[in-house]
Each structure stands twice: as C-alpha cells, then as structure tokens.
C-alpha cells in the first residue's frame, strides 16, 4: 500500500511540477496569497450552504459565554472572508486575525453585510503568535477550517488559552483525517502533498482532535461527523467547543 501511495504521489508530482518549480523559486507563496482569498470567497458560499445547520448548532450557545457586561467579546483566528459573521449573535464585538492581509477587502464587504455585529479590528498575524491580543481579554475564540493549515497546532492552542478569560470558550469546526481503514484516507495520503501546496498549507491528514485533547482545557465537547459536503476528501469533520 505504501508503495502504491508513493507511485501515485510521484505521478501527481510530475503533473504539478510547474507549481513545485514556482515554489522552489519562491514565487508560489506570493501567488497563492493573492489568489487564495478569491477561491475562498467562492468556496465559503458553498460550504456555508452545505454546513449551515451544523454551524447554527455549533454557535447556538455563544451568548452564554458573554462577560458581565452582557456583550460577547469574540476573537476569530484565521477569519478569512468573514464567512462565520452571519452566525454570530447581535451586538457581538468581533476582532479578526489572519496572516494573509489580502483578506481585508473581503472582510470589509462582510462587515457591511453584517450590521448586527460590532467590528473592532483586523490584525495581520499568525495564530501561533497573537501578541497583539492581551491575556484573558476575550470571551470566545473561534477557528473554522484553520487547524488544518497552521504550522503548529499546540502553539496556537496555547495562544487560544492565553487570550481567553477564565471560563471562556474555544469553538472549532475542522476537516480531519478519515479513518485509516477507508479508501478516503488512502486518497487523502496520495493527494496531501499537492493539496498542501495548492491550498495555502492545508493538510488533509491531520488528526486535529488529538491536539485538542492534549490542550489544557477544563472541558472539551467534540463530535466526529461525516459532513454533507460535495468533496469527499474533506467530509471527515470534527466540531465543538472547549472551555478554559
């Protein structure tokens, strides 16, 4: 099986060699950062349509974590185009963080379409180093389709715990590796290197639930599901929330 995976990966490498050459020359990262927001703004429309019920379920109790003022302070890490905004409760104070500055113009459009929120600021930073956000300063942190592409899951989860107030919550929805015995997992392994390059560092075979289980949360509510998505490769999902 490993030999078959190697041969198929080699074939895909040959087919996508121009991308690897651009990456070797240091050009692909710049191109990817430019085009990825345009891809994501279209992908998230489809994703939100197919995952709307799960997102509404996930975010249904957000307001329960509001601070004494009654207003919810929310930090979204890897905010992308602002696809989650419509699921947040009215009056929610939202800060966004993303390492790609090219998302900002799409965020501005999303903010204009979601007047029920109080937008605070957009910070260009990686989730592994959110030094611009003070310790214990937010009620809720949200990550959706982010843990698949971060460079260090343990570090970003430590940062999440740092910025959350005691009793605050971390909400997540992530595609993950399929069960090892399935054909889906086989094709995830075959396509993972090319997928990682093409989709801005995204990984198909991450077992993100393990990092969440190891993190220093006092409570973890996590579910595994087969998401109702068109792309079978990303149907295996986890979603839920963890309390600091």
Curated annotation (Swiss-Prot):
GO terms for MF: methyltransferase activity; mRNA m(6)A methyltransferase activity; RNA methyltransferase activity; thiol S-methyltransferase activity
Spans annotated as Targeting to lipid droplets: 1-28
Conditions for induction: Silenced by miR-6807-5p.
Gene Ontology terms: biological process: lncRNA processing; methylation; odontogenesis; osteoblast differentiation
Catalytic reaction list: a thiol + S-adenosyl-L-methionine = a methyl thioether + S-adenosyl-L-homocysteine + H(+); an adenosine in mRNA + S-adenosyl-L-methionine = an N(6)-methyladenosine in mRNA + S-adenosyl-L-homocysteine + H(+)
Domain of life: Eukaryota
GO cellular component, one term: membrane
InterPro entries on file: Methyltransf_11, SAM-dependent_MTases_sf, Thiol_S-MT
Mod. after translation: Methylated at lysine residues most likely by EZH2.
Annotated signal peptide: 1-29
Cell membrane keyword on record: no
Mechanisms controlling activity: Inhibited by 2,3-dichloro-alpha-methylbenzylamine (DCMB).
Enzyme Commission (EC) number: 2.1.1.9, 2.1.1.348
Cellular compartment(s): Lipid droplet; Endoplasmic reticulum; Membrane; Microsome
Tissue: Expressed in the liver.
Function: Thiol S-methyltransferase that catalyzes the transfer of a methyl group from S-adenosyl-L-methionine to alkyl and phenolic thiol-containing acceptor substrates. Together with TMT1B accounts for most of S-thiol methylation activity in the endoplasmic reticulum of hepatocytes. Able to methylate the N6 position of adenosine residues in long non-coding RNAs (lncRNAs). May facilitate lncRNAs transfer into exosomes at the tumor-stroma interface. Promotes osteogenic and odontogenic differentiation by regulating the expression of genes involved in stem cell differentiation and survival. (Microbial infection) May be involved in the assembly and release stages of hepatitis C virus (HCV) life cycle and thus play a crucial role in HCV propagation.
Record text on subunit structure and interactions: (Microbial infection) Interacts with HCV non-structural protein 4B/NS4B (via C-terminal region); this interaction may promote the recruitment of NS4B in the proximity of lipid droplet.
Additional remark text: Selectively methylates drugs containing thiol-moieties such as 7alpha-thiospironolactone and mertansine.
Name this polypeptide is given: Thiol S-methyltransferase TMT1A
Species the sequence originates in: Homo sapiens
Gene: TMT1A
């Amino acid at each position: 099986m490993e030999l078959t995976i190697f041969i198929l990966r080699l074939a895909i490498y040959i087919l996508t060699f121009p991308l690897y050459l651009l990456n070797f020359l240091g050009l692909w990262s710049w191109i990817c950062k430019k085009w990825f927001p345009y891809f994501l703004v279209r992908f998230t429309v489809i994703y939100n349509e197919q995952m709307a019920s799960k997102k509404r379920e996930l975010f249904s109790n957000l307001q329960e974590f509001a601070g004494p003022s009654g207003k919810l302070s929310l930090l979204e890490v890897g905010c992308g185009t602002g696809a989650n905004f419509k699921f947040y409760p009215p009056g929610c104070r939202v800060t966004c963080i993303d390492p790609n500055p090219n998302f900002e113009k799409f965020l501005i459009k999303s903010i204009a379409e979601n007047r029920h929120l109080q937008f605070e600021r957009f910070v260009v930073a990686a989730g592994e180093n959110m030094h611009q956000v003070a310790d214990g300063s937010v009620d809720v942190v949200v990550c959706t389709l982010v843990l698949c592409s971060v460079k260090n899951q343990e570090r970003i989860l430590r940062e999440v715990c740092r910025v959350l107030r005691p009793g605050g919550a971390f909400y997540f929805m992530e595609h993950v590796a399929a069960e090892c015995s399935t054909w889906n997992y086989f094709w995830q392994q075959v396509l993972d290197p090319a997928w990682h390059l093409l989709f801005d560092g995204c990984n198909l075979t991450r077992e993100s639930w393990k990092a969440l289980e190891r993190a220093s949360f006092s409570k973890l509510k996590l579910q595994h599901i087969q998401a109702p998505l068109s792309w079978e490769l990303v149907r295996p999902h986890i979603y839920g929330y963890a309390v600091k």
